[in-house]
Amino acid sequence: MKLTDKIRRVYLPMTETGFYILFCLQKEGHGYSITQKVKDMTDSQVLIGPGTMDGTLSKMEKDGLISFVREEEKRKIYRITDLGHKILDIELKRIERLYRNSREEG
């Protein structure tokens, strides 16, 4: 899939949930493993509920940001796609710019 205007409008800037899901899926994973990793990475400050996780994974898969790899013990394993990497890279650059600007002004 291509980085269309629609994809840009929907995903940029990213929600915190969307960002962490794409970030975690740089390595294959399932919803629960992502939830636990995000909880650990953020010292429990970001908690993604199962409904939010399932809905976001489903939408991202439909939009081509992630792809289903296989099923293990009734859990769907996903990974980020090239389009997902593009979105994540754009968002990381935006966050870096925000940080840089805050340092220059502060």
List the model feature ranges, each with a label:
Residues 73-91:
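Basic, amphipathic "hinge/linker" alpha-helix immediately C-terminal to the N-terminal HTH DNA-binding motif
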Residues 86-106:
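Amphipathic alpha-helical dimerization/coiled-coil segments
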Residues 1-13, 96-98:
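Intrinsically disordered, low-complexity serine/threonine- and proline-rich regulatory segments
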Residues 61-73, 79:
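Beta-hairpin "wing" of winged helix-turn-helix
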Residues 8-52:
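N-terminal helix-turn-helix DNA-binding core of bacterial DNA-binding proteins
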Residues 53-60:
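Basic amphipathic alpha-helical segments that dock to polyanions
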